[in-house]
């Protein structure tokens, strides 16, 4: 029997993000998930190695790679709709859960329990870091769009920056203080 899990995961590159906004450059959930994994790994390293608090960078990065996997089946629901009210938010969480279970069902039985925590993150510390990395990735997208002259992202940048600040996560605060402004630099300025 041919299992379809990885073939379906590879289709993440066809699911676009920011569907309600005019984009200077398109972003798909595969690209986004990679950036979230890089950021989650970095945040966890900051937490562990700089702030001397427990964190598992590898688990955070792995969970981040799959954090939007359910969208292969659901598509990317725009944030204003997803969080419009508590009922819609709850219903969408249920849809995501069903989607993740469907994805797990596409794996051989012996692999399902290994992938379950990646698709249904249950460790609150890992989930918090992945959530911060997800929001940080969204903010970086806004910064890049604004840098390209796309004012469409002004409100999203402002709201996302506020949401990041309100997370009160020390590793995120450290990242924002020491790394975030570099995303506004040109290639020549980065060297």
Language-model segments: residues:
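Alpha-helical, largely C-terminal catalytic domains
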Residues: 1-191
């Amino acid at each position: 029997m041919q299992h379809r899990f990885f073939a379906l995961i590879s289709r993440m590159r066809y699911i676009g993000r920011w569907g309600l906004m005019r984009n200077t450059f398109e972003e798909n959930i595969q690209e986004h998930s990679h950036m979230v994994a890089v950021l989650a790994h970095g945040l966890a390293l900051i937490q562990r190695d700089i702030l001397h608090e427990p964190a598992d960078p590898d688990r955070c990065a792995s969970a981040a790679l799959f954090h939007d996997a359910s969208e292969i089946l659901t598509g990317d629901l725009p944030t204003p709709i997803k969080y419009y009210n508590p009922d819609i938010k709850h219903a969408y969480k249920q849809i995501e859960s069903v989607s993740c279970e469907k994805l797990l069902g596409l794996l051989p039985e012996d692999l399902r329990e290994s992938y379950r925590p990646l698709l249904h993150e249950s460790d609150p510390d890992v989930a918090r870091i992945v959530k911060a990395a997800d929001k940080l990735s969204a903010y970086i997208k806004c910064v890049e769009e604004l840098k390209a002259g796309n004012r469409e992202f002004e409100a999203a940048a402002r709201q996302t920056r506020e949401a990041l600040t309100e997370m009160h996560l020390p590793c995120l605060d450290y990242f924002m203080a020491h790394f975030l402004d570099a995303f506004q630099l040109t290639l020549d300025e980065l060297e």
